Amino acid sequence: MHINSVVRNYRFLIGALTALMLLLLLRSSASPQVGSLANSNKVDTPDGLKVPGASSPISQNINEDSQKQTAKDHTSQNLESGSNSLSKSQCTEGHKYVVMIDAGSTGSRVHVYEFDVCTQPPTLINETFEMLKPGLSSFDIDAVGAAKSLDPLLKIAMDAVPKDKRNCTPVAVKATAGLRMLGDEKSSKILAQVRKHLEQDYPFPVVDGDGVSIMDGEEEGVYAWVTANYLLGNIGAGSKLPTAAVFDLGGGSTQIVFEPSFPPNEKMVDGEHKYELSFGGHDYTLYQFSHLGYGLMQGRNKINTELVNVAISSGTITKGQTARTYELSSPCLPPGTTAEGEKVKISDDEIYTVNFKGPKVPAGPQCRYLADKILNKDAKCNTPPCSFNGIHQPSLVHTFKETSDLYVFSYFYDRTQPLGLPLSFTLQELQDLARTVCNGEEVWESVFSGIEGSLSELSKEPQWCLDLNFQVSLLHTGYDIPLQRELRTAKTIANNELGWCLGASLPLLESANWSCKVSKVE
């Protein structure tokens, strides 16, 4: 009897253990699995161009380094599982490189991108960046000199791309507003010489067609939007997320691009400002516009033109007599400062040389008035609402969420970071900074003494008062951004340079418009 009881207990124990093991096995098999990423991240541009989409988002830490930026291994871990990742034994291409040269109005920049193409979509592994001055447009009629000015940048590209990859690494040169304003004849000669120099003296295959060209302002803005939102992880990440608006301020033009949202019974008005984009399996309807002639350097010239025209009206300057140098007071300079030898271009054949000097007392509000004036807010608005110059723009207040980011970069960054503004600030803080700078040296010491390098920056560049007032006018008066709205700025995100170049480089991973060079030029 005792033995039978032991046997029954033993059988019960074995049964319980077996049931427990089965339960654990069932729970294990029901555990959620890592899902595969979308297979077809593509950008559809209006002219049918298929652009490989971005990889899984790079981490969102913002690193502000020196002008030379190198990003290492930020995204490779994101695509190692799921159907999007090709096995290394199946993939024979390995890494691909793209060389993109940004020929801007004030300088040229090279970006060398390295992608792991054994993932779908390709993974951005590395970026090498460097810039130099002056820009191609400064060479005017010296087309050969303009082409050779790119040699230091191309040497950096040669060093960044392995020797055995160079003959299959496409290169493109995209010029922006500065070259556009030289006129068709001069700019065409410069671009032709640049293409010739690349084809004859470097091993990189030059992209056919518009590989060496002046980029359309529409493309410039949209590619900048793609770059910023890709690096922020807002696009190409699977699910559709809110996107950031971008405001890019160059030397010759400025771009605005954002994704407005409308009530169900409304939609964006059709027109050249409307840009339909497909990226990472999601559709985006963007508002974009490139305001040619409203980059920082052109803004300076417009404000100084107002002062020269007043001087012509009063007889201080004799119209048409451009051989001499004139002396004028400017409210856009701090007291006690001068800006000598400034070239004020009224027209192609009417360029005055002026020594500007600051007033006896600060005149920042008068400078702001001039900055507002050149925006032509009173221009006829055929399709309301409008930003400036009669250009239609959906209201950022009513169609863009307050919780979504507004990113301002390029000259916005260059004029705020040396003076101590953080990477996130309100438009009111930018306006206060402009007022402080315009007040002059008497207040600079107490405000900027603790910010390394700021006093020397202000001393060597007297135009910061003008520049900051122009930026405040552009954002507040022009784009109607409230003073309390928070702005974000950056030069890089995860060590990758902001701007249009990354977005424009993605199509070049496909060789539809270029082919490897058979004979290498080393």
Swiss-Prot record:
Pathway field: Protein modification; protein glycosylation
Keywords, alphabetical: Golgi apparatus, Hydrolase, Membrane, Signal-anchor, Transmembrane, Transmembrane helix
PROSITE patterns: GDA1_CD39_NTPASE
EC supergroup of this enzyme: hydrolase
Membrane spanning stretches: 7-26
Protein's GO biological process: nucleoside diphosphate catabolic process; protein N-linked glycosylation
Span list, region Disordered: 35-89
Extent of Basic and acidic residues compositional bias: 65-75
EC number: 3.6.1.42
Reactions listed under catalytic activity: GDP + H2O = GMP + phosphate + H(+)
An annotated Gene Ontology molecular function: GDP phosphatase activity
Lumenal face of the membrane: 27-522
Biased amino acid composition, Polar residues: 76-89
PANTHER family, A to Z: ADENOSINE/GUANOSINE DIPHOSPHATASE (PTHR11782), GUANOSINE-DIPHOSPHATASE (PTHR11782:SF83)
Function recorded in the entry: After transfer of sugars to endogenous macromolecular acceptors, the enzyme converts nucleoside diphosphates to nucleoside monophosphates which in turn exit the Golgi lumen in a coupled antiporter reaction, allowing entry of additional nucleotide sugar from the cytosol.
Family affiliation: Belongs to the GDA1/CD39 NTPase family.
Name of this chain's protein: Guanosine-diphosphatase
Organism this protein belongs to: Kluyveromyces lactis (strain ATCC 8585 / CBS 2359 / DSM 70799 / NBRC 1267 / NRRL Y-1140 / WM37)
